[in-house]
């Protein structure tokens, strides 16, 4: 007599794999932000979602209505990042931001510390190559003077700045965590994915 076996459903196994993957992704995110809670770490964050590219030619720093700004998705991204950071123990960070409104708004919506404008975090898109290089050197010099044993520092900036410092190309609301080195330099230790 031929032995017949009933085919098993793959759904329970598939569900188990999906839940395990989700659990690992959540753990990795929490661990990543816990790095920032350790002394001598910096989060270099691209501003949250602001539809479009660049800014209009008549853009003025003092007038947000002339700039690209966060949309609802961007505001929700910034709030979600702030919640994740606070859950990892980052509650009293030094937060520096580009002067553009989309960065300032992202920094404020994180709600993890006092926000201060830092001009060297502003976009370099409209600068000449010598101006761009000078600004990046000034930002590197600022980072080199941060205390290696200090609390968390967050820089809210633009993709061009993150890329110039780390060769990373984060999506809006994404970034990298840097470890400050004793010699005044830094190294990239983790990527921060943008919240969905």
PLM region descriptions:
Residues 1-8:
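N-terminal secretory signal peptides that target proteins for export/translocation
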């Amino acid at each position: 007599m031929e032995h017949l076996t009933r085919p098993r459903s793959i759904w329970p196994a598939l569900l188990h794999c999906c839940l395990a993957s989700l659990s690992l992704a959540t753990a990795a995110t929490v661990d990543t932000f816990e790095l920032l809670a350790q002394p001598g770490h910096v989060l270099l964050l691209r501003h949250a979602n602001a539809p479009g590219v660049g800014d209009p030619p008549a853009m003025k720093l003092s007038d947000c209505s002339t700039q690209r700004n966060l949309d609802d998705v961007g505001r929700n991204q910034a709030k979600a990042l702030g919640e994740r950071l606070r859950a990892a123990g980052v509650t009293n960070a030094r937060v520096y931001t580009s002067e553009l409104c989309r960065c300032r708004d992202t920094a404020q919506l994180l709600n993890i510390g006092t926000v201060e404008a830092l001009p060297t975090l502003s976009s370099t898109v409209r600068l000449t190559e010598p101006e761009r290089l000078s600004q990046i050197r000034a930002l590197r010099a600022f980072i080199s003077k941060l205390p290696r044993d200090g609390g968390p520092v967050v820089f809210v900036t633009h993709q061009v700045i993150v890329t110039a410092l780390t060769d990373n190309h984060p999506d809006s609301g994404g970034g990298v965590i840097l470890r400050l080195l004793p010699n005044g330099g830094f190294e990239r230790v983790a990527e921060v994915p943008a919240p969905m």
